[in-house]
Amino acid sequence: MSYIPFPDISPELFSIELFGVTFALRWYALAYIAGLLIGWRLVLRMIRAERLWSFGPPMTEDQLERLLTWVILGVILGGRLGFVLFYQPAHYLAHPLDILKVWEGGMSFHGGFLGVMTALVAFCLKERISILPVADLLAAATPPGLFLGRIANFINAELWGRPTTLPWGVAFPGEAAQSCPGIEGICARHPSQIYEAGLEGILLFTVLSLLVWRRGWLHWPGSVSGMFLAGYGATRFLVEFVRQPDAQFVSAGNPLGLAWQISGYGLTMGQILSLPMILLGLYLILRSRRTA
Protein backbone atom coordinates (compact mmCIF):
# COMPACT_ATOMS: atom_id res chain seq x y z
CA MET A 1 0.00 0.00 0.00
CA SER A 2 1.35 3.41 -0.96
CA TYR A 3 1.19 6.30 1.47
CA ILE A 4 2.87 9.61 2.28
CA PRO A 5 5.24 9.59 5.28
CA PHE A 6 4.51 12.33 7.78
CA PRO A 7 7.04 15.17 7.34
CA ASP A 8 9.52 15.62 10.16
CA ILE A 9 8.34 19.03 11.39
CA SER A 10 8.62 20.03 15.02
CA PRO A 11 5.38 21.46 16.49
CA GLU A 12 7.58 24.11 18.12
CA LEU A 13 8.89 26.93 15.95
CA PHE A 14 11.55 27.70 18.56
CA SER A 15 12.03 27.62 22.31
CA ILE A 16 14.06 29.63 24.80
CA GLU A 17 14.92 29.03 28.44
CA LEU A 18 14.69 31.86 30.97
CA PHE A 19 15.43 31.40 34.65
CA GLY A 20 15.12 27.65 34.33
CA VAL A 21 11.74 27.80 32.59
CA THR A 22 11.38 26.84 28.92
CA PHE A 23 9.11 28.99 26.75
CA ALA A 24 8.18 27.67 23.32
CA LEU A 25 6.43 29.28 20.36
CA ARG A 26 4.33 26.60 18.72
CA TRP A 27 3.05 26.69 15.16
CA TYR A 28 -0.49 26.57 16.55
CA ALA A 29 0.02 29.76 18.55
CA LEU A 30 1.65 31.42 15.54
CA ALA A 31 -1.37 30.45 13.43
CA TYR A 32 -3.71 32.18 15.90
CA ILE A 33 -1.57 35.33 15.97
CA ALA A 34 -1.14 35.48 12.19
CA GLY A 35 -4.83 34.74 11.59
CA LEU A 36 -5.91 37.59 13.87
CA LEU A 37 -3.45 40.05 12.30
CA ILE A 38 -4.45 39.10 8.74
CA GLY A 39 -8.12 39.32 9.68
CA TRP A 40 -7.59 42.75 11.22
CA ARG A 41 -5.89 44.03 8.06
CA LEU A 42 -8.65 42.64 5.85
CA VAL A 43 -11.38 44.27 7.95
CA LEU A 44 -9.45 47.55 7.92
CA ARG A 45 -9.23 47.41 4.13
CA MET A 46 -12.99 46.85 3.83
CA ILE A 47 -13.76 49.71 6.22
CA ARG A 48 -11.66 52.07 4.10
CA ALA A 49 -13.33 51.02 0.82
CA GLU A 50 -16.31 53.40 0.71
CA ARG A 51 -17.74 51.83 -2.46
CA LEU A 52 -18.56 48.66 -0.51
CA TRP A 53 -21.08 50.46 1.70
CA SER A 54 -24.47 52.04 1.07
CA PHE A 55 -24.29 54.40 4.04
CA GLY A 56 -20.66 54.21 5.10
CA PRO A 57 -18.81 51.55 7.13
CA PRO A 58 -20.50 50.32 10.32
CA MET A 59 -17.63 51.30 12.62
CA THR A 60 -14.50 53.44 12.79
CA GLU A 61 -10.90 52.28 12.74
CA ASP A 62 -10.59 53.09 16.45
CA GLN A 63 -13.60 50.89 17.19
CA LEU A 64 -12.02 48.10 15.16
CA GLU A 65 -8.90 48.20 17.34
CA ARG A 66 -11.04 47.89 20.46
CA LEU A 67 -13.09 45.09 18.90
CA LEU A 68 -9.91 43.09 18.24
CA THR A 69 -9.38 42.63 21.99
CA TRP A 70 -12.93 41.36 22.40
CA VAL A 71 -12.50 38.95 19.49
CA ILE A 72 -9.28 37.52 20.93
CA LEU A 73 -11.00 36.83 24.25
CA GLY A 74 -13.99 35.31 22.45
CA VAL A 75 -11.82 32.98 20.37
CA ILE A 76 -9.73 31.72 23.28
CA LEU A 77 -12.43 31.43 25.95
CA GLY A 78 -15.14 30.22 23.59
CA GLY A 79 -12.86 27.76 21.82
CA ARG A 80 -11.68 26.22 25.06
CA LEU A 81 -15.07 26.09 26.79
CA GLY A 82 -16.65 24.73 23.62
CA PHE A 83 -14.19 21.84 23.56
CA VAL A 84 -14.84 21.16 27.25
CA LEU A 85 -18.64 21.18 26.91
CA PHE A 86 -19.07 19.58 23.48
CA TYR A 87 -16.38 16.90 23.47
CA GLN A 88 -15.07 15.96 26.94
CA PRO A 89 -17.47 17.21 29.65
CA ALA A 90 -17.03 14.14 31.87
CA HIS A 91 -13.24 14.45 31.98
CA TYR A 92 -13.24 18.15 32.81
CA LEU A 93 -16.01 17.73 35.37
CA ALA A 94 -13.74 15.27 37.18
CA HIS A 95 -10.60 17.37 36.59
CA PRO A 96 -11.74 21.04 36.43
CA LEU A 97 -8.22 22.45 36.68
CA ASP A 98 -7.38 20.79 33.35
CA ILE A 99 -9.62 23.38 31.69
CA LEU A 100 -6.81 25.90 32.21
CA LYS A 101 -4.23 23.74 30.40
CA VAL A 102 -4.79 25.27 26.97
CA TRP A 103 -1.19 24.53 26.00
CA GLU A 104 -2.06 20.82 25.92
CA GLY A 105 -4.50 21.45 23.06
CA GLY A 106 -8.26 21.15 22.94
CA MET A 107 -9.99 24.00 21.10
CA SER A 108 -13.35 23.85 19.34
CA PHE A 109 -14.18 25.97 16.29
CA HIS A 110 -17.88 25.88 17.13
CA GLY A 111 -17.10 27.04 20.67
CA GLY A 112 -14.81 29.76 19.34
CA PHE A 113 -17.56 30.85 16.98
CA LEU A 114 -20.05 31.17 19.85
CA GLY A 115 -17.43 33.03 21.89
CA VAL A 116 -16.79 35.54 19.10
CA MET A 117 -20.52 36.01 18.51
CA THR A 118 -21.06 36.71 22.21
CA ALA A 119 -18.17 39.19 22.23
CA LEU A 120 -19.44 40.80 19.02
CA VAL A 121 -22.98 41.32 20.34
CA ALA A 122 -21.70 42.71 23.65
CA PHE A 123 -19.29 45.07 21.87
CA CYS A 124 -21.87 46.35 19.41
CA LEU A 125 -24.40 46.99 22.16
CA LYS A 126 -21.77 48.83 24.18
CA GLU A 127 -20.69 50.94 21.19
CA ARG A 128 -24.28 51.31 19.90
CA ILE A 129 -23.48 50.09 16.40
CA SER A 130 -25.33 47.64 14.14
CA ILE A 131 -24.47 44.00 14.73
CA LEU A 132 -24.98 42.41 11.30
CA PRO A 133 -22.73 44.75 9.25
CA VAL A 134 -19.90 44.22 11.74
CA ALA A 135 -20.53 40.46 11.69
CA ASP A 136 -20.22 40.59 7.88
CA LEU A 137 -16.78 42.18 8.21
CA LEU A 138 -15.56 39.51 10.60
CA ALA A 139 -17.03 36.70 8.49
CA ALA A 140 -15.26 37.87 5.34
CA ALA A 141 -11.93 38.06 7.19
CA THR A 142 -12.09 34.74 9.07
CA PRO A 143 -11.14 32.07 6.45
CA PRO A 144 -7.39 32.91 6.32
CA GLY A 145 -7.22 32.21 10.05
CA LEU A 146 -9.06 28.93 9.55
CA PHE A 147 -6.57 27.97 6.83
CA LEU A 148 -3.59 28.66 9.08
CA GLY A 149 -5.20 26.84 11.99
CA ARG A 150 -5.77 23.69 9.93
CA ILE A 151 -2.19 23.75 8.66
CA ALA A 152 -1.06 24.00 12.29
CA ASN A 153 -3.29 21.02 13.11
CA PHE A 154 -1.47 19.06 10.40
CA ILE A 155 1.97 20.07 11.70
CA ASN A 156 0.89 19.03 15.19
CA ALA A 157 -0.25 15.65 13.77
CA GLU A 158 -3.70 16.07 15.35
CA LEU A 159 -7.30 15.91 14.14
CA TRP A 160 -6.34 13.45 11.42
CA GLY A 161 -8.80 11.55 9.27
CA ARG A 162 -10.06 7.99 9.11
CA PRO A 163 -7.90 5.16 7.71
CA THR A 164 -7.61 5.10 3.92
CA THR A 165 -5.90 3.14 1.15
CA LEU A 166 -5.77 6.14 -1.17
CA PRO A 167 -2.26 7.04 -2.36
CA TRP A 168 -2.32 10.43 -0.62
CA GLY A 169 -3.06 8.90 2.78
CA VAL A 170 -0.59 10.11 5.41
CA ALA A 171 1.09 7.89 8.01
CA PHE A 172 0.72 10.14 11.04
CA PRO A 173 3.02 9.39 13.99
CA GLY A 174 1.90 8.26 17.41
CA GLU A 175 0.23 5.22 18.91
CA ALA A 176 -3.29 6.62 18.54
CA ALA A 177 -2.85 7.47 14.86
CA GLN A 178 -1.38 4.04 14.12
CA SER A 179 -4.07 2.16 16.04
CA CYS A 180 -6.34 1.04 13.20
CA PRO A 181 -8.44 -2.09 13.82
CA GLY A 182 -8.14 -4.60 10.99
CA ILE A 183 -5.04 -2.98 9.48
CA GLU A 184 -1.62 -4.57 9.90
CA GLY A 185 1.56 -2.59 9.47
CA ILE A 186 1.54 1.12 8.65
CA CYS A 187 -1.87 2.82 8.95
CA ALA A 188 -2.37 5.70 6.52
CA ARG A 189 -5.12 8.21 7.20
CA HIS A 190 -6.95 10.94 5.33
CA PRO A 191 -5.13 14.27 5.80
CA SER A 192 -8.45 15.82 6.79
CA GLN A 193 -6.70 18.93 8.10
CA ILE A 194 -5.51 19.67 4.55
CA TYR A 195 -9.00 19.04 3.17
CA GLU A 196 -10.41 21.55 5.65
CA ALA A 197 -7.65 24.07 4.96
CA GLY A 198 -8.56 23.96 1.28
CA LEU A 199 -12.34 24.07 1.74
CA GLU A 200 -12.98 26.34 4.72
CA GLY A 201 -9.80 28.31 4.17
CA ILE A 202 -8.99 28.83 0.49
CA LEU A 203 -12.35 28.04 -1.16
CA LEU A 204 -14.52 29.89 1.37
CA PHE A 205 -12.21 32.92 1.36
CA THR A 206 -12.32 33.04 -2.45
CA VAL A 207 -16.13 32.88 -2.51
CA LEU A 208 -16.59 35.51 0.20
CA SER A 209 -14.02 37.84 -1.39
CA LEU A 210 -15.81 37.66 -4.74
CA LEU A 211 -19.16 38.38 -3.07
CA VAL A 212 -17.74 41.34 -1.14
CA TRP A 213 -15.54 42.98 -3.79
CA ARG A 214 -17.31 41.99 -7.02
CA ARG A 215 -20.96 41.50 -6.04
CA GLY A 216 -21.31 44.15 -3.35
CA TRP A 217 -22.84 41.86 -0.74
CA LEU A 218 -21.87 44.21 2.10
CA HIS A 219 -24.77 46.39 0.92
CA TRP A 220 -27.10 43.70 2.33
CA PRO A 221 -26.37 43.30 6.07
CA GLY A 222 -26.26 39.68 7.13
CA SER A 223 -25.68 38.21 3.68
CA VAL A 224 -21.90 37.72 4.02
CA SER A 225 -22.31 36.30 7.52
CA GLY A 226 -24.95 33.94 6.19
CA MET A 227 -22.75 32.72 3.37
CA PHE A 228 -19.87 32.16 5.79
CA LEU A 229 -22.04 30.16 8.18
CA ALA A 230 -23.63 28.08 5.43
CA GLY A 231 -20.31 27.57 3.65
CA TYR A 232 -18.35 26.57 6.72
CA GLY A 233 -21.15 24.36 8.01
CA ALA A 234 -21.49 22.55 4.67
CA THR A 235 -17.75 21.96 4.18
CA ARG A 236 -17.27 20.82 7.77
CA PHE A 237 -20.28 18.50 7.46
CA LEU A 238 -18.73 16.86 4.38
CA VAL A 239 -15.21 16.52 5.80
CA GLU A 240 -16.62 14.84 8.91
CA PHE A 241 -17.27 11.75 6.77
CA VAL A 242 -13.50 11.18 6.49
CA ARG A 243 -12.36 12.83 9.72
CA GLN A 244 -11.59 10.59 12.69
CA PRO A 245 -14.07 11.37 15.49
CA ASP A 246 -12.88 12.12 19.01
CA ALA A 247 -11.88 9.01 20.94
CA GLN A 248 -14.60 9.35 23.56
CA PHE A 249 -17.28 8.74 20.89
CA VAL A 250 -15.65 5.60 19.45
CA SER A 251 -16.42 2.17 20.86
CA ALA A 252 -16.70 -1.43 19.70
CA GLY A 253 -20.40 -0.92 19.09
CA ASN A 254 -19.89 2.52 17.55
CA PRO A 255 -16.72 2.34 15.41
CA LEU A 256 -17.71 5.41 13.36
CA GLY A 257 -17.85 7.56 16.48
CA LEU A 258 -21.39 8.81 15.86
CA ALA A 259 -22.75 11.15 18.52
CA TRP A 260 -26.33 10.42 17.41
CA GLN A 261 -27.51 7.38 15.50
CA ILE A 262 -30.58 5.35 14.66
CA SER A 263 -30.66 2.02 12.79
CA GLY A 264 -26.95 2.25 12.03
CA TYR A 265 -27.13 5.74 10.53
CA GLY A 266 -26.23 8.90 12.36
CA LEU A 267 -24.15 12.04 12.70
CA THR A 268 -20.85 12.91 14.32
CA MET A 269 -20.66 15.69 16.88
CA GLY A 270 -19.07 17.96 14.26
CA GLN A 271 -21.98 17.35 11.89
CA ILE A 272 -24.55 17.97 14.62
CA LEU A 273 -22.92 21.30 15.48
CA SER A 274 -22.64 22.26 11.80
CA LEU A 275 -26.32 21.79 10.93
CA PRO A 276 -27.53 24.83 12.94
CA MET A 277 -24.81 26.91 11.25
CA ILE A 278 -26.08 25.91 7.81
CA LEU A 279 -29.70 26.68 8.71
CA LEU A 280 -28.85 30.01 10.34
CA GLY A 281 -26.67 30.94 7.36
CA LEU A 282 -29.44 30.26 4.86
CA TYR A 283 -31.88 32.23 7.00
CA LEU A 284 -29.56 35.26 7.12
CA ILE A 285 -29.06 35.19 3.35
CA LEU A 286 -32.82 35.04 2.67
CA ARG A 287 -33.52 37.68 5.31
CA SER A 288 -30.95 40.08 3.88
CA ARG A 289 -32.53 39.82 0.44
CA ARG A 290 -36.06 40.36 1.72
CA THR A 291 -35.08 43.44 3.71
CA ALA A 292 -32.83 44.92 1.01
Swiss-Prot record:
GO BP annotations, alphabetical order: lipoprotein biosynthetic process
Highest taxon in the source lineage: Bacteria
Alphabetical list of PROSITE patterns matching this protein: LGT
Presence of the UniProt keyword Cell membrane in the record: yes
Annotated pathway: Protein modification; lipoprotein biosynthesis (diacylglyceryl transfer)
Protein topology in the membrane: Multi-pass membrane protein
Keywords: Cell inner membrane, Cell membrane, Membrane, Transferase, Transmembrane, Transmembrane helix
Residues reported to bind a 1,2-diacyl-sn-glycero-3-phospho-(1'-sn-glycerol): R150
Record-stated family: Belongs to the Lgt family.
Primary role: Catalyzes the transfer of the diacylglyceryl group from phosphatidylglycerol to the sulfhydryl group of the N-terminal cysteine of a prolipoprotein, the first step in the formation of mature lipoproteins.
Stated name of the protein: Phosphatidylglycerol--prolipoprotein diacylglyceryl transferase
Organism of origin: Cereibacter sphaeroides (strain ATCC 17023 / DSM 158 / JCM 6121 / CCUG 31486 / LMG 2827 / NBRC 12203 / NCIMB 8253 / ATH 2.4.1.)
Protein's gene: lgt
